[in-house]
């Protein structure tokens, strides 16, 4: 299953991370719908708003179905046929949707039949492993392996469409297959857009943590086909729904257990052997500053906005091809950052908020 995610990037940086090619091969950035509803967070839970990609054709009848929109949507699908005036009164859980029953349950079959497919964006997701012989559960952060590309430059250098994709050399966002629906309050009011994340059996690498995982769309082709309901039928799109082994993970602190905790500490690897958090060195602090390019809260007029050109970049010496995890607790790229120069620089205090 998938019940907690992280999506901390500020809006402009998230947009650049979603650069794509349209059907004509032109580099594009997706446009936003209801951008003010997006609230970055290291610790997103159901009923919060998360950014999703969807086809522009859902909003404009004559649009090219390969063109994309980013829209914040409520996590937890509210069916269009729901009759109550309060969506929180929905009596069943729609946070996730099992792939093996998606065409059996009305809540998911109807919007899927209308082409309401979306891609849920996240840095990664959290999952909890039940510790044998105890009631305790160990949380893990799960994400795409971060691979060094041939791209160069900085985010601030993206001064033309041709450069948008070339300069994005940062964290690869996790792209999860979702279904959305549109609910209109019986008494009138704004339409509520909400989504569910499709889940599949866990891949071998995650099976020790949990028996289910999100349906991850690995690569631009898979994302394009899932979104393009104008050209790709439901039957063809469902062939994209399957487990993937192209993931990595590391153990994190129990700080993430409380969804009100919203700091980079939620993502920081912990050492399960000594049961303590890896202390943050100067290098890891710079990494955490990148994770916190902007405080994960709604825009505050009192706080000057950081210029795009000031957003730190991943150093090429750390952006190496990450091997698939061979054992539980592999921390991958984040752990390399947190461990580097541990003994060479003064220990910095870790950010924490309750």
Curated annotation (Swiss-Prot):
Effect recorded for residue 127 to Q: Abolished ability to mediate self-reversal of covalent cross-link with DNA in presence of doule-stranded DNA
Residues bearing the modification Thiazolidine linkage to a ring-opened DNA abasic site: 2
InterPro entries in UniProt: SRAP, SRAP-like
Domain of life: Eukaryota
Keywords carried by this UniProt record: Autocatalytic cleavage, Chromosome, Covalent protein-DNA linkage, DNA damage, DNA-binding, Hydrolase, Isopeptide bond, Lyase, Phosphoprotein, Protease, Ubl conjugation
Activity modulation notes: Formation and reversal of DNA-protein cross-link depends on DNA context. Catalyzes formation of the thiazolidine linkage in presence of abasic sites in single-stranded DNA. Mediates the reversal of the thiazolidine cross-link in presence of double stranded DNA.
Site residues (Required to stabilize abasic sites), renumbered to this chain: 210
Subunit structure: Interacts (via PIP-box motif) with PCNA.
Domain notes: The N-terminal catalytic Cys-2 residue forms a thiazolidine linkage to a ring-opened DNA abasic site. Glu-127 catalyzes reversal of the thiazolidine linkage; self-reversal is favoured by duplex DNA formation. Glu-127 is also involved in sensing abasic sites in single-stranded DNA (ssDNA). His-210 stabilizes the abasic sites by forming a hydrogen bond with the O4' hydroxyl group.
Job description of the protein: Sensor of abasic sites in single-stranded DNA (ssDNA) required to preserve genome integrity by promoting error-free repair of abasic sites. Acts as an enzyme that recognizes and binds abasic sites in ssDNA at replication forks and chemically modifies the lesion by forming a covalent cross-link with DNA: forms a stable thiazolidine linkage between a ring-opened abasic site and the alpha-amino and sulfhydryl substituents of its N-terminal catalytic cysteine residue.
Identification of the protein by name: Abasic site processing protein HMCES
Organismal lineage: Eukaryota, Metazoa, Chordata, Craniata, Vertebrata
Gene: HMCES
């Amino acid at each position: 299953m998938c019940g907690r995610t992280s999506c901390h990037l500020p809006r402009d940086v998230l947009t650049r991370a979603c650069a794509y090619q349209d059907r004509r091969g032109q580099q594009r950035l997706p446009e936003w719908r209801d951008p003010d509803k997006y609230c970055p967070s290291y610790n997103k839970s159901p009923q919060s708003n998360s950014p999703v990609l969807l086809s522009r054709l859902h909003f404009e009848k004559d649009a090219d179905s390969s063109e994309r929109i980013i829209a914040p949507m409520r996590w937890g699908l509210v069916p269009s046929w729901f009759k109550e005036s309060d969506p929180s009164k929905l009596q069943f859980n729609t946070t996730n949707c099992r792939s093996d029953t998606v065409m059996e349950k009305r809540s998911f079959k109807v919007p899927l039949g209308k082409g309401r497919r979306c891609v849920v964006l996240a840095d990664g997701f959290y999952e909890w492993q039940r510790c044998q012989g105890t009631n305790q559960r160990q949380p893990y952060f799960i994400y795409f392996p971060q691979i060094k590309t041939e791209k160069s430059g900085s985010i601030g250098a993206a001064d033309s469409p041709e450069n948008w994709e070339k300069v994005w050399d940062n964290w690869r966002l996790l792209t999860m297959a979702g279904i959305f629906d549109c609910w209109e309050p019986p008494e009138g009011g704004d339409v509520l857009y909400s989504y569910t994340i499709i889940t599949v059996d866990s891949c071998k690498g995650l099976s020790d943590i949990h028996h289910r995982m999100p349906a991850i769309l690995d690569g631009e082709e898979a994302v394009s086909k899932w979104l393009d309901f104008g050209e790709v039928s439901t039957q063809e799109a469902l062939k994209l729904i399957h487990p993937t082994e192209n993931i990595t993970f590391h153990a994190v602190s129990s700080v993430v257990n409380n969804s009100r905790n919203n700091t980079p500490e939620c993502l920081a690897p912990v050492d399960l052997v000594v049961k303590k958090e890896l202390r943050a060195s100067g290098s890891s602090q710079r990494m955490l500053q990148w994770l916190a390019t902007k405080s994960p809260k709604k825009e505050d007029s009192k706080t000057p906005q950081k210029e795009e050109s000031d957003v730190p970049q991943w150093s090429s010496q750390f952006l190496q091809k990450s091997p698939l995890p061979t054992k539980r607790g592999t921390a991958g790229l984040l752990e390399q950052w947190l461990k580097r120069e541990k003994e060479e620089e003064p220990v910095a205090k870790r950010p924490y908020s309750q």
